[in-house]
Amino acid sequence: MNKIVKFFTLLTLCCPIVACGDYLDTSTPENADDGFVTSTASETFKILSWCYANYRQNCVMGVYRWNDPIGSDAEYYPEVASLNNANARLQPELLSIGTANSAFNGYYTIVARVNKLLDIIGTKEEYIQAKEAGEVNEWTQLYGESLSMKAFCYFELVKHYGDVPYGYENTTASEYSLNSRFEILDKVIEMFGEAAPLMYRLGEGGITAERMSRGFAEAMAGMAALYSGGWQTVRTDVQGLYGDVQLETKGVDEYSSIYARRTDYLDYYRTAETYFDQAMADKGTATLVTTDERGYADNPFQRHFQYQHDLQLSPESIFEIGNMQGGQSGQTTSSEYPYAFGRASNGASQMGAPCKVFGAVRIMPTFYYGEFEDGDMRRDITATVTGSNGDGNEAILRFAPGNKLDGGMTTNKWDPNRMNPPYVADQRQSGMNWPIMRLADLMLMRAEVKAVLGNDVAARSDLNDVRRRAFGDTNHDIQSSGDQLLADILQERKLEFAGEGQRRWDLIRNGLFVEKAVEVRAEMSQMVADLQSKGYHEFANGNQIPMYIWVKSVHRDNPLTYDADPTDPALYPGWRGQYDYSTTDAASAVKGTDHNLAIEGLFEYIDPSSERAKQLEADGYVKTDWGKGIVDNADHYCNSNLLPGVKAGNVPPRYYFPIPFEVLSHSNGKVTNGYGLAQE
């Protein structure tokens, strides 16, 4: 009964305006008079602050956000036989019905609060006068921000749950019914479009990337149109659900669902193009990070991520959810960067050097070895072959399934060693913000849409602006057109955003998910076969992944490394090493003085019986399993953990979470879970 009462509080949405604590206070607010808490713009923003915090604490991780980047042809989850990634493996039928309740409830809680807020702000004279005059002030910003928050929550609900109830906020409903995702996304586009002109651009009116801005609202309107027009898995078990929307399909029906796209998709791509153009015009101070002012490093791509490590806002960021480091008892927040998304560490939960990093997002070896061109500065930032032992020493990652140092190569975009200084008091309290959208994402989504619509010149312009940052020159510009240009843009998005959560959705909406899943399964199987028969596998670019590598602990005065130096095995690949933990509160955890790893044979086969191997071992290098770990766990890497839900090749990708049981039980049968998801 308590669960039902709680759920009704959240979904029926009879929710008063409440006084809230500061932006990061996630405790339940006390009831207060509506007029008081909206008496000034600063008091009103406290309500929005609570909504931002509720999204961070209950929604973004309530749908296990690391599921977004671990179900693709570039990323995977490291553990074996875990239900944590059943959704990402495209096996949602294994999930319990309560798997993602907190996010579902959290979204509707936010919708209720901002909807009430919209009603109150909409009657304020300061808002009415500014809107009628076509001016932006703090009240129009708050109204637009509230409306954007509502639209954002519904977009996320459709993205992660499919067709859901819509429009019940601040009403007393005795039962609920499903609404078509297409109907909801039309409303989302409309809401973002209405909100945008009421809001400041980044840099205006004190608005930073920790708040929704005009450019973000326009980018999200474009994104909603892109998702509505793209391929997606729809239900076939609810008659009349999609009304007059006509769909084309591919593959077969499975679990009463099928892979489909609306036939008028080009209309939605045109809408997306319009909003993406507006977002670029209204981006304010957001700018692509194309230079690196640091004298000790020259990697503009990494410079963007370094801002996050420094607990600063990157100039490239359009929107990110604010966080805080540490905090008093009862006020701590979840910092999944770097814990779930970062470079792995075997460290202790507290006072580690560095603390534990689980590393839920792992990078496919076929992607790391086979898809980056020479000179692409993104490779060593995107993935790493080493982690942290937790005692101040660098350690090679292992392909045995597991977490921390086990599980394979991790992302390298977030590494506790890059903080200054690393937060060693406790795991998951780094204080790093949750990134939601950066400018390169907007640019490449716009390029994608323009390519589909045949505007190749404009598409190439955005594409090559991003590539020039990656290579530092114009020599790698793309000159393709038509279908090949679209393929090049999607590949660029893969290279640019691996580990960030975009690749899975890029493939789904472009109708390529099943095709690419089958391809990567075949690539991994061929790699394993070659490792078994030859001791290595060679990729088209000449890189070789071997069964074994040779590693050696070495001393460096500064154990934290930066740009790669191919002549120094301790500096190649680059951007690894360790922070000097002897200078931190975790100094007692540090062991030894040779904290770095020199690596030989990572990209070329060294015959274990060769003179070179013997000389390396004589020099103190240790022969270490590398590709052998993949061979020893071939089923995990080629089958059971690699997108098995679509291995048949002609079935729909099923990637949704279940709607909570309480909704189903109070809908008189009008709301059910589809896609093979649990009903109770």
Where are each of the predicted segments found?
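Bacterial Sec-dependent N-terminal signal peptides
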Residues: 1-29, 506-509
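Long, intrinsically disordered, low-complexity segments
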Residues: 19-21, 107-110, 246-260, 306-338, ...
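An aromatic- and glycine-enriched ligand-binding surface/loop that stacks and positions planar moieties
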Residues: 21-88, 164, 211, 215-218, ...
